[in-house]
């Protein structure tokens, strides 16, 4: 299954459908249609998961995979590596994109660039939008030798010819390619996982196994390094893999410093994949939240220059996956906002000018970024119920909840 097909991790087609059908009558018709879709989908998923329990690689099998990302080796006389975090302007997963960029930038161990397939606005899923620092064309002009590391987040068009061609050229120049979450689809479609060990988002693994049979798909690891290719599980695995990259580039002490700032105790790849699976309860939560369109609401997040984009990404991502709420950024003006680590954020709305949100979150405090995610999940549980918070943690593949 390609990332462009309907699944719970692709752009929120369900919520977008409701926005496009204005009348209650039309919305009710869509709701009943969704009931059938979810019922069919749940049967398919449960069947796939039963197969996984029988045929999926176990912990013992995963032990033979490299535990550490190979240490950085300088090329082209560079004093530190060039890292390209590349997304598709049409739609790219928010946290997959922002966290690797921000963690590596914060570490001051690499020259990191947020780039897009072109120079226009990049829509981030499930919320927010930015203007990339470079397009792939301008990046190539600036660094004709290529990047040392290329981070590939989940994108809506995982078979984009432009993205696949560019990724292959970077790999041919010696770049290490990191597929984060469903960014693994892009890496696999580029042919870079042939004969490799890899992992991926729990919901996608069965489909990845079926389509890419020449790849050894491994469970129970949040990230896997095999030669010059690294792959991860779902969204929140962007945190440990980014810290592992910092360690590979600048050493464990530097990685530990950044980890403490984020509120992370370690970045070990060990993982219990069996915890993450779609259940009847999960399907019921999705369905009941989706059809309760009268209680859908917007969550306003105030942003200003210097905003912590890691906290912003984690909070906006979580609130926009409840199937009850959508995060929207508010600023004092429509001007582009430069975040703490240099991303160019484009506000969704302007205070006092545009429609207000149903709820406005308080400003971020000084708590570490991962603490902000924990607090957000607790808030989601209070507002929408614990089952909704558990579903959000499931989709984020967040083991700490």
Language-model features and meaning:
Residues 226-229, 234-246:
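Loop-centered beta-sheet repeat module
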Residues 31-41:
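Bacterial N-terminal signal peptides
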Residues 217-230, 263-264:
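Conserved Rossmann-fold dehydrogenase catalytic segment
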Residues 1-26:
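N-terminal secretory signal peptides that target proteins for export/translocation
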Residues 194-220:
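A conserved active-site-flanking secondary-structure segment within enzyme catalytic domains
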Residues 89, 197, 227, 231-234, ...:
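Glycine- and other small-residue-rich loops at beta-strand/loop junctions that grip anionic moieties
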Residues 44-177, 185-189, 219, 240-401:
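Extended, subdomain-level signal for the structured scaffold at the beginning of enzyme domains
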């Amino acid at each position: 299954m390609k990332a462009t097909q309907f699944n719970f991790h692709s752009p929120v087609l369900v919520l977008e459908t409701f926005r496009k059908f204005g009348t209650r009558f039309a919305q009710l018709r869509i709701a009943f249609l969704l009931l059938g879709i979810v019922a069919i989908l749940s049967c398919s998923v449960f069947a796939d998961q039963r197969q996984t329990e029988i045929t999926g690689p176990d912990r013992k099998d995963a032990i033979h995979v490299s535990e550490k990302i190979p240490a950085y080796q300088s090329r082209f006389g560079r004093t530190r590596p060039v890292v390209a975090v590349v997304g598709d302007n049409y739609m790219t997963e928010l946290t997959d994109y922002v966290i690797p960029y921000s963690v590596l930038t914060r570490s001051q161990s690499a020259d990191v660039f947020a780039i897009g397939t072109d120079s226009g606005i990049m829509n981030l899923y499930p919320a927010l939008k930015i203007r990339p620092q470079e397009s792939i064309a301008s990046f190539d002009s600036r660094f004709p030798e290529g990047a040392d590391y290329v981070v590939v987040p989940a994108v809506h068009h995982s078979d984009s010819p432009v993205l696949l061609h560019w990724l292959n050229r970077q790999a041919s120049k010696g770049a290490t390619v990191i597929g984060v979450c469903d960014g693994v689809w892009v890496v696999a479609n580029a042919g870079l996982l042939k004969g490799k060990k890899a992992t991926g988002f729990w919901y996608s693994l069965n489909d990845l196994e079926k389509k890419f049979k020449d790849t050894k798909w491994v469970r129970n690891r949040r990230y896997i390094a095999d030669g010059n290719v690294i792959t991860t599980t779902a969204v929140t695995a962007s945190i440990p893999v980014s810290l592992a990259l910092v360690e590979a580039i600048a050493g464990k002490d530097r990685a530990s410093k950044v980890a403490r700032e984020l509120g992370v105790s370690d970045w070990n790849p060990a993982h219990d994949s069996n915890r993450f699976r779609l259940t009847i309860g999960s399907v019921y939560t999705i369905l009941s939240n989706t059809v309760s369109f009268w209680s859908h609401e917007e969550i306003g997040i105030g942003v200003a220059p210097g905003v912590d984009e890691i906290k912003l990404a984690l909070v906006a991502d979580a609130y926009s996956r409840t199937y009850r709420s959508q995060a929207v950024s508010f600023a004092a003006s429509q001007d582009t906002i430069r975040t703490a680590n240099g991303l160019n954020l484009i506000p969704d709305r302007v205070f006092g000018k545009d429609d207000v949100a149903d709820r406005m979150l308080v400003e971020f405090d000084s708590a570490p970024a991962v603490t902000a995610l924990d607090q957000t999940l607790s808030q989601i549980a209070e507002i929408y119920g614990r089952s909704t918070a558990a579903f959000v943690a499931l989709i984020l593949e967040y083991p700490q909840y």
